[in-house]
Amino acid sequence: MGDLENLLLEAAGRTNSAGRSRHPPSSRRREGSYSDGSSDSRDDSDEDRGYASRKPSGSQVPLKKRLEAEREDRAARVEGGYGDGPSDREGDSSEESDFGDDLYKNEEDRQKLAGMTEFQREMILSERADKKGDKNFTEKLRSKRESEKTPVSKKETQPLPASRGVRSSARSADRAAAKDDALNELRAKRMKQQDPAALRKLRDASKGGSGSRDFSSTKRKPLASSNLSSSSQSDSDSRSQSDDEGSNGGMLDSDDDRSDVPTFEDVKEVTIRRSKLAKWLMEPFFEELIVGCFVRVGIGRSKSGPIYRLCWVKNVDATDPDKTYKLENKTTHKYLNVVWGNETSAARWQMAMISDGHPLEEEYRQWIREVERTNGRMPTKQDISEKKEAIQRTNSFVYSAETVKQMLQEKKSASVRPMNVAAEKDRLRKELEIAQSKNDEAGVERIKSKIKQLDASRNKKGVDKKALKLAEMNKKNRAENFKNASEVKSITASLKAGEAGYDPFSRRWTRSSNYYNGKNKGKDGEENEAAVAAAVETNGADAGAGVEATEAALEAAAEAGKLIDTRAPIGQGAEHNQLHNFELSLSLTALQKYGGPQGVQKAFMARKQLTEATVGCRVAENDGKRHGLTLTVSDYKRRRGLL
């Protein structure tokens, strides 16, 4: 803070930063004063006035001359860009004097602001408060500067020799340049604290201004050395040399920024490949080391091949343990937030999408152009060298006991192996005994809750055991059904229990039949015939072999007192099929004169050609064949060019 106050006090004789930020035209006018033209005009004005900037006391100078001297002094300050005169404050006074301490002009202004949105009203009041604070700060600096002024004796009002005037002009120019450097340094410190990116832009934009200041300083140096004495010459030389160093500071800083951009080889050395990410995934230094490194992210494919972007790693995101993915032969829930250009383009990517190859120089140039286009953060060579050293230190990393314990815990949580509930429960019981011996109530409750969770997980597995067995059985049956459907084999349904090939779970064709028996022991033939006739009507069967067999079976069942159908019922459709079971000889030799199997296609093509020749209209190409609508895997790969 001491350096900042000294810089503020040193700059008090010129202007303040608040005024410069509020008035861009005046700031441009003051920046223009850094050039050699303004400095020469300031030197000439000092010579013409004969060192009149040192005014005598008001009691010794007549009123008319004192007023003229004040007007000349005010005009000189405006030309030199001092900005402390009344002309610089006219714009502020016209606005700042309109509102009072409550930041409102009048009741009409209060009602007008009340009708606005809260955001607009707060923005206007904030701007007024800033202007009022800047005005108070300016008045304090002006009053302090005026209080530090000392009355000048009458001897200093005498005309000075030409050499004295030139020396005073050179010294005043040196003082102005020193103030300019102090203000530039103060502005650079403030901008560095608030916005480093804006500071870099300001340095790049100030290359032209620094060059003009360099030229003006070299122009002042021979002027002073040619007219001053030997003692004053050495003094002015040292001051002009310091001015040269100060004026060259902006250009040197800008050149340093250009030379501080990391080269392709630097970026290549800190680019981490996918295999290295998989190796460092469970290491304790991974989340800290990977920040600031570069990775190649695969964003898609083109005709020429995959497309990669060279991105800078911002941080590691491991906030969602449920979203896991595979990386090499490991399972992880860690994602990388990477930046390409500006930090507003940060995106989360899986480490499985990172390339395992080295970056290309074209990708490096694309990244440089994107950073410059979006005004993003450019890592310096110092950052790259520090990251290289950090990567080298991983080879000699020393694992502490706490680190090893943490790594084991992470590997255990990331493991996909099923947990041994009995062993885990036994371990928790031992920990419970230790916690009870130490009277650790919190530890006891925590361990008991874990034991309850293990019991609940075991009960849940027991409930799901039956469902799992049924699911396995269904899966087995589906596989068997698919196998039977794909294989052509005869299924013998006439096998009985105990015979070879008999399957009790195989499906058989059945047909429902309704039986009834009014008298258990009745043997009257008429009643049996009536029962048979009723059964025949129910089944829709006619007289025949099937009906006789069914009648015999029913009669035998009635005599035994049982209602068991020993043979599959035969309906009218079955008998009709049996009647048409005979061989019919057909000959296709008569079709040979029409072209045989290809006759249909030939006839279609002939009719198509005749129609097109006669009508002159094209016939749709439909050859009458049914083409396959499916492709095999090999055909698909061949068409896609994968084979």
Curated annotation (Swiss-Prot):
It comes from the Eukaryota. The lineage of its organism: Eukaryota, Viridiplantae, Streptophyta, Embryophyta, Tracheophyta. Residues 65-77, 124-157, 172-188 have a biased composition (Basic and acidic residues). The modification N-acetylglycine is found at G2. This is Protein RTF1 homolog. Keywords: Acetylation, Flowering, Nucleus, Phosphoprotein, Transcription, Transcription regulation. Gene3D superfamilies: Plus-3 domain. GO terms for biological process: flower development; negative regulation of flower development; positive regulation of DNA-templated transcription. Residues 1-107, 124-262 are annotated as: Disordered. Component of the nuclear PAF1 complex (PAF1C), which consists of VIP2/ELF7/PAF1, VIP3/SKI8/WDR61, VIP4/LEO1, VIP5/RTF1, VIP6/ELF8/CTR9 and CDC73. The modification Phosphoserine is found at S87.
